[in-house]
């Protein structure tokens, strides 16, 4: 009788098994997302594959598997996962956009453009496809379509300040600084594999170079260091053992999470540099760093004066810039600023700073720049 009753009970609740299976899929997807955030991309892929074993037609699981595969540089496999997500859910805007991204990385430009255009058509209020499409047009030298793409985003009210910045860069119109929203969004998107891309793919070694010079000039081990635009903490890692206090400032929360995971920083704050410095005490730091940060600010005069005020007498200000010809800073087509050496030297001449070191230096990829180390007199 009991067995018969149980059979009747389960027959009267036909959705029980499906609900349990659905919960299992959701749990696997959430586990994969957490592993992705922690940088465990192979573990994330395994979790999404478990979800797909239970639900082969789950479009989100295919999409997220694509993300995990992309982060492992398995680009063709990632493209296949995105395409499967699109087959299952043709209007999946994020899948079209990310398919375009991996196709661009695979140097399949025409296919990438088509994917981005489809993402824009399907999600006309979603900003990332406009950004990717406009940038790819820019790389291809198609400034007319790049400008039209940025203008379309502005017309729809999408992240207007950021797209105006990119449009100004495209048209050769130099502005004072990049909008905080632009810089924040840029690095929020870079955070997942920022170090690998910057170091392994672009040969970025500015933090190590700055650290070598600073260690020679200020060999004490209890220094108070302020790391402006600290990102994932590459400068903190390069200067390990040289400080008693290490403060990091950055606009991007995801980048700060990476820095926090290093357990090197005394304090980490999500803020613009200018806003944070307004409230910082005077003569509070032995060293101020700005590695690959000033490229998002054109007019550096207010920043130099503020930094000089926060340094102790004899303190060091170490930074890198991209180099421009002429006498004035310029906004480049990349959306970054470049500064002439003469312009930099005109700034510190009136701010109580003197040059200790200044030399050309490879910044990243095909970008050359200059490193300065100044001392407060």
What do the predicted segments below correspond to?
Residues 226, 230-277:
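Class I SAM-dependent methyltransferase SAM/SAH-binding core
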Residues 314-322:
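Conserved beta-strand signature within the Rossmann-like core of class I S-adenosyl-L-methionine
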Residues 301-313:
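A short glycine-rich, Lys/Arg-flanked "PGG" loop and its adjoining helix->strand segment in the class I
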Residues 26-37, 60-71, 94-105, 128-135:
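Conserved alpha-helical positions within TPR/SEL1-like repeat arrays
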Residues 278-288:
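A short acidic, Gly/Pro-enriched loop at the edge of an enzyme's catalytic core
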């Amino acid at each position: 009788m009991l067995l018969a009753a149980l059979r009747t009970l389960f027959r009267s609740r036909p959705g029980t098994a499906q609900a349990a299976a659905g919960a299992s899929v959701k749990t696997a997807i959430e586990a994969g997302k957490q592993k992705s955030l922690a940088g465990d991309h192979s573990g994330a892929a395994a979790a999404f594959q478990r979800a797909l074993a239970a639900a082969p037609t789950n479009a989100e699981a295919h999409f997220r598997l694509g993300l995990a595969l992309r982060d492992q540089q398995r680009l063709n496999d990632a493209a296949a996962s995105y395409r499967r997500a699109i087959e299952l859910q043709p209007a999946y805007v994020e899948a079209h956009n990310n398919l375009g991204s991996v196709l661009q990385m695979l140097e399949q430009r025409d296919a990438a453009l088509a994917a981005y255009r489809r993402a824009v058509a399907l999600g006309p209020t979603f900003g990332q496809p406009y950004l990717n499409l406009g940038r790819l047009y820019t790389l291809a030298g198609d400034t007319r379509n790049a400008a039209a793409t940025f203008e379309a985003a502005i017309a729809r009210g999408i992240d207007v300040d950021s797209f105006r910045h990119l449009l100004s860069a495209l048209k050769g119109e130099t502005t004072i600084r990049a909008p905080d929203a632009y810089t924040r969004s840029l690095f929020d998107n870079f955070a997942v594999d920022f170090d690998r891309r910057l170091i392994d793919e672009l040969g970025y070694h500015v933090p190590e170079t700055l650290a070598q010079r600073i260690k020679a000039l200020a060999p004490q081990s209890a220094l108070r260091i302020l790391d402006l635009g600290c990102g994932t903490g590459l400068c903190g890692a390069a200067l390990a053992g040289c400080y008693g206090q290490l403060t990091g400032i950055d606009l991007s929360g995801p980048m700060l999470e990476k820095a926090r995971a290093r357990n090197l920083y005394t304090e980490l704050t999500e803020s613009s540099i200018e806003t944070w410095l307004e409230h910082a005490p005077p003569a509070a730091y032995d060293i101020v760093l700005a590695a690959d940060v000033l490229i998002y600010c054109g007019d550096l005069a207010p920043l130099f004066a503020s930094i000089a005020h926060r340094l102790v007498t004899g303190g060091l200000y170490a930074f890198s810039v991209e180099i421009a010809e002429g006498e004035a800073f310029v906004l480049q087509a990349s959306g970054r600023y470049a500064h002439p050496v003469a312009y930099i030297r005109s700034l510190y001449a009136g701010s109580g700073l003197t040059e200790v070191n200044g030399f050309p230096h490879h910044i990243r990829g095909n970008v050359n720049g200059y490193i300065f180390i100044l001392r407060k007199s």
